[in-house]
Amino acid sequence: MAESEAETPGTPGEFESKYFEFHGVRLPPFCRGKMEDIADFPVRPSDVWIVTYPKSGTSLLQEVVYLVSQGADPDEIGLMNIDEQLPVLEYPQPGLDIIKELTSPRLIKSHLPYRFLPSDLHNGDSKVIYMARNPKDLVVSYYQFHRSLRTMSYRGTFQEFCRRFMNDKLGYGSWFEHVQEFWEHRMDANVLFLKYEDMHRDLVTMVEQLARFLGVSCDKAQLESLIEHCHQLVDQCCNAEALPVGRGRVGLWKDIFTVSMNEKFDLVYKQKMGKCDLTFDFYL
């Protein structure tokens, strides 16, 4: 698999130079040199994979999945480093070799597009939970995230960043392709496709879906307790006082987008998603 340097003018040079292009997809530098190893990564039937485009509610989803699958409670999760329990496949730490040796059942995360995930996943050898988020809220959160980084800090304006998003020029490539690839596989027996907004609109149904998908059996009282704990996680994650400008809430984009930006975004969205029947709630 060939890798080539990607260079796109009109963005801060420091930010731009960090990325590379792999089979037409812009990827972060820590993915360089390991994509073949990722494709060949051995999966297990007991694995549970959480896959998202960045800033799609990954942190919240991983906590809910951990709670449902492990029977943990929110206080316990709050005291642990959950990222150690659910490593990201392509990140430098802990690395592929260590993830390979983790005891089963492994919980593994990734932001990679469907086509770059381990080939065994395509054969249905492990369970995959994918969560998508409406792209307007996502791009605001992604911008705030990049502004906060030290090594990959983005110093341009939100308008510039949003244009990059619409033109598929951010890390992990096109959001539009990312979600549509997984949407096409939503009926696969080993795939559960979720939407971030449903955590806020109908958490009960989502928890029930997760429990069934993960093979977790519980009586009515246990399910009610599980749902109550998940509500606590959602409330903690989306507390507007705890996060910059209420980063986890639905409809965040309305505080940031101008009328002109929104019109341009809607046009691009229609062009790139027009043939797809996947829909999103942009506010609740």
Swiss-Prot record:
List of residues that carry Phosphothreonine: 8, 11, 205
Subcellular location: Cytoplasm
UniProt KW Cell membrane keyword: no
Swiss-Prot/TrEMBL GO biological process terms: dendrite arborization; steroid metabolic process; sulfation; sulfur compound metabolic process
One GO cellular component term noted in the UniProt record for this chain: cytosol
EC number: 2.8.2.-
SUPFAM superfamilies: P-loop containing nucleoside triphosphate hydrolases (SSF52540)
Predominant location category: cytoplasm
GO molecular function terms listed in the Swiss-Prot or TrEMBL record: identical protein binding; sulfotransferase activity
Keyword list, A-Z: Cytoplasm, Lipid metabolism, Phosphoprotein, Steroid metabolism, Transferase
Protein task: Atypical sulfotransferase family member with very low affinity for 3'-phospho-5'-adenylyl sulfate (PAPS) and very low catalytic activity towards L-triiodothyronine, thyroxine, estrone, p-nitrophenol, 2-naphthylamine, and 2-beta-naphthol. May have a role in the metabolism of drugs and neurotransmitters in the CNS.
Protein's UniProt name: Sulfotransferase 4A1
Organism from which the protein derives: Rattus norvegicus
Lineage: Eukaryota, Metazoa, Chordata, Craniata, Vertebrata
